[in-house]
């Protein structure tokens, strides 16, 4: 838990002992404000997925807001989170604060089209694929699966950005850092907040 987040004791009816509740975090969740401020891994992905599903069941016509400041992360938990964003009934508005790199960029692009925003000084980084980093034995065993995941991510970017397959494929072959305005021109976000 972050330093300075207020907590209060709360007793659930029927429980003998009180437990500590994070007031601020619960309040933000009730307002449908979700935060990805770390690498995408199984734990944060599962937390965000469960919150999105719970909040969409609770009120299916009120938008969810996913604030992203992430250096990237694991592919499979990221794709699971992306799929959930597409599945839930409410629109998911994505907002880039600071950095949305690799899987963070993928999730930023996965927000509801016309509701993807980046702050003016945000940096967006397209995912780069570096298959050569794995050891040879692992590479041979996992190459087919890696190629399938790469194709999936590439197709999603093509669909979400409106760019051609060759442009997205070329971008994924090299490190591409973009400003918020460049990300808007590239179709990853729809709006750039004004200063």
UniProtKB/Swiss-Prot annotation:
CDD domains: S14_ClpP_2. GO terms for cellular component: chloroplast stroma; endopeptidase Clp complex. Pfam families: CLP_protease. Keywords: Chloroplast, Hydrolase, Plastid, Protease, Serine protease. Its EC number is 3.4.21.92. The keyword Protease applies. It catalyses: Hydrolysis of proteins to small peptides in the presence of ATP and magnesium. alpha-casein is the usual test substrate. In the absence of ATP, only oligopeptides shorter than five residues are hydrolyzed (such as succinyl-Leu-Tyr-|-NHMec, and Leu-Tyr-Leu-|-Tyr-Trp, in which cleavage of the -Tyr-|-Leu- and -Tyr-|-Trp bonds also occurs). The active site is at 102 (nucleophile), 125. It is found in: Plastid, Chloroplast stroma. InterPro entries: ClpP (IPR001907), ClpP/crotonase-like_dom_sf (IPR029045), ClpP/TepA (IPR023562), ClpP_Ser_AS (IPR018215). SUPFAM superfamilies: ClpP/crotonase. GO terms for biological process: protein quality control for misfolded or incompletely synthesized proteins. One of its GO terms (molecular function) is serine-type endopeptidase activity. Belongs to the peptidase S14 family. Cleaves peptides in various proteins in a process that requires ATP hydrolysis. Has a chymotrypsin-like activity. Plays a major role in the degradation of misfolded proteins. Component of the chloroplastic Clp protease core complex. This is ATP-dependent Clp protease proteolytic subunit.
């Amino acid at each position: 838990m972050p330093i300075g987040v207020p907590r209060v004791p709360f007793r659930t009816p029927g429980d003998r002992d009180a437990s500590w509740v994070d007031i601020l975090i619960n309040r933000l969740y009730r307002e449908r404000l979700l935060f990805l401020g770390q690498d995408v891994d199984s734990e944060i992905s599962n937390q965000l997925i469960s919150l999105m599903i719970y909040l969409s069941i609770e009120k299916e016509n009120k938008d969810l807001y996913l604030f992203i400041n992430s250096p990237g992360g694991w592919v499979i938990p990221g794709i699971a989170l992306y799929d959930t964003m597409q599945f839930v009934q409410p629109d998911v508005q994505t907002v880039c604060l600071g950095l949305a790199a690799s899987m963070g960029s993928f999730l930023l692009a996965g927000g509801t089209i016309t509701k993807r925003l980046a702050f003016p000084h945000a940096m967006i980084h397209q995912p780069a694929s570096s298959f050569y980093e794995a050891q040879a034995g692992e590479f041979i065993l996992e190459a087919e699966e890696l190629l399938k995941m790469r194709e999936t991510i590439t197709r999603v970017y093509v669909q979400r950005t409106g760019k051609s397959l060759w442009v997205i494929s070329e971008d994924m072959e090299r490190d591409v850092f973009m400003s918020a305005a460049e990300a808007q021109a590239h179709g990853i976000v729809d709006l750039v907040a004004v200063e």
